[in-house]
Amino acid sequence: MEEQGRDHKAAVAPRRAIVFVHFDPHGRFDPHVHHALACYRPLADHLVVVSNAARQLPATLAPLVDGFLPRANVGYDFAAWRDGLATLTPGAHDEVLCINDSVYGPLFDLRPALAAPRLADADLWGMVLSDQSTSRSKPRVPHVQSWFLGMRRRLLESDLWERFWRNVRPERDKRQTIERYEIGFSEAAAAAGFRIAGLYDATTAPPVTLAEVWPHLSPRHPRRSWRLLRKCRRRPHNPSELVWWRLWEAGVPYLKVGLLRVNHYGLDLGRVMADLERRTEYNLGLIHGHLRRCG
């Protein structure tokens, strides 16, 4: 573990740690990651970056970061978070956030989300509570999407916490990782009596309406439009990559990178970007630059 100095120490929320997991195909820290870390710094009294790609932390990021942990790119995010969490002092924090760089943002102030009343009593929480399974044959289990996990002291000091992270093993299969760790963590926590919650709760949200997706339909793009019509009617869906407008309205200040890079649901990406520019002050150049470089 390489300790990094800081040039300044801003006012912070008491006893909160953030473990941020980074991956980049070229081993770089993209400007949108710089932006994210600058936003997280005032919100944490301890900020650790775990990189599955870079061997060194750029000098420009050193003042923002308390610890840097380079590691091999194995085990997806949960193995990386396991290693990052192991660097924290036990019992030193009331809340730990595990966040990855699969999202652009924060697009707007994150502090209201962290203080949201609907999350106040949760032991395990996140930006999105979903019940999407890895296949239609699997049961639908409410779970916190793992790109942003918040965990509070009652859970942090439990036997479940220690047992879960001790048993995290690097998995080669992404679907198995999701089932065993993303879904499995929430399922085990709920079964043990811990409360789980999401700022946007897809498990209680109404179905996607035709009126909501209508602006994304176009006779000029019939195949994309048909894909959107077909997929938006399925339940459950991935709320982070389909109903991004609902997430913003719920106070979730993020946009999934995969929504723009893959566009699984067939959204009008030009409209997404226009809406982003209209609703937020986020620098769209960060998104355009990242997509040009990484595709």
State the predicted function of each range.
Residues M1-G295:
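ER/Golgi luminal nucleotide-sugar-dependent glycosyltransferases, focusing on the catalytic module
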